[in-house]
Amino acid sequence: MKLPILVTLFITLPALCVSSKTPSAPTISAYPKSPGNFKPASGRQNSTSNVCEVKPNQTDAAPGILAAAHTCNNGGTVFLPPGDFVVATALDLTFLNNIDFAIWGNITFKKDIDLWTTQAFQYTFQTASLFWRFGGNNVNIYGDGKGVIDGAGQYWWSAMAEDSSVMRPCLLGTDGLHHATISGLTMLNSPNWFNLIANSTDILISNMTMLVESEISDAPAKNTDGWDIYRSSNIVIQDSRIVNTDDCVSFKPNSTQIVIQNLDCTGSHGISVGSLGQYQGETDIVEDLYIYNISMTDASDVARIKVWPGVPADTSGSTSGGGLGRVRNVTYEHMQSENNDHIISVSQCYESKNQTMCDSYPSKLVIEDVLFKDFKGTTSKKYDPEIGELTCSSPDVCHNITVQDINVTPPSGDSPTFTCNNMGNSNLEDITCA
């Protein structure tokens, strides 16, 4: 009897089999906000016969995952069932087309700094690197509340405490991913950023959980941003919980048309634009952002914009400011603050030693048309009664910043104040600049 071709694949590739179990992909949509012309993945793949189940593998699951992706590409589903999957080979999944990834198992990455120093996918921007990356068109990646990606962060943070130059990969990355959804995954203890969204468009990310816990006080978690978005547009991140030690979300250069909504962030540095303008001569653009309905607790800031100042005219090749570009059309609305140091921090003098030096070399990156609206809650005692900072390097490069409907109380109960510098024609009637 002639064996069906898919059974033959099972015989020749023991790590891969065709499963009769068809995981149920969630139906999710951007709500209540979305960018114009937003088009994430078209929904669950229709084929119920083309489901490639990858067997758990505690030596190296990467070959099995890669084989499944090739076999079930163009209309199928890759299924990682409950069990342990150790990835010990860098996994390039940037060829995907019309495919689902159902991750119900526990994914970890081999603890081997030398291995990942040579194998991880390297990016010049802020020396980011990735264990694995997803790219392609019309892709759904989902965990249904079962899947876990564990970065074993303490191993990497301890190594960094001994050698600050240790390369630490991000836990999940997209590079050239278009029309996609990512949902229902728990991510633990990332060595570096949890997620890098690069060179991608039309991605809906929903119902994610990200948790960081350091076990050694002398080797704390470092750089555990929830999401870093870089050279990407039409992105929605929503309905997720993040407990970390760095930015909850960070908009890196050339992030546009993005909605962030319904997040619960704890212990972070806030929802941050930047830092931008760090590299002399390079142009960074971040515009058309809507950040809505965020709960922020025990953070340094709720809403934050970080821009480097300019540099002296005779400077060449600076990596400490002098970059070009703009931050434009950014809205933070309906933000709940609990015990955060500042509710709003705008700095066009990021990493500058003092305001006088920053005033001498104003930023070449313009901030304009920014709205902070409807902030409620409390701040910490760190700057009491100051609840925010608005610092531009010159009124010539800082326009139309509006702060309104602020109902935030410092611990002392005194009238809240802001530090304000070079704000020019901004609309600050609803706050007190001290």
From Swiss-Prot:
GO terms for biological process: carbohydrate catabolic process; cell wall organization; pectin catabolic process. It catalyses: [(1->4)-alpha-D-galacturonosyl](n) + H2O = alpha-D-galacturonate + [(1->4)-alpha-D-galacturonosyl](n-1). One of its GO terms (cellular component) is extracellular region. Transmembrane segments: none annotated. PbH1 repeats lie at residues 232-253, 255-275. Pfam families: Glyco_hydro_28 (PF00295). PANTHER family: EXOPOLYGALACTURONASE X-1-RELATED (PTHR31736:SF14), PTHR31736. This is Probable exopolygalacturonase A. It comes from Aspergillus niger (strain ATCC MYA-4892 / CBS 513.88 / FGSC A1513). The lineage of its organism: Eukaryota, Fungi, Dikarya, Ascomycota, Pezizomycotina. The gene is pgxA.
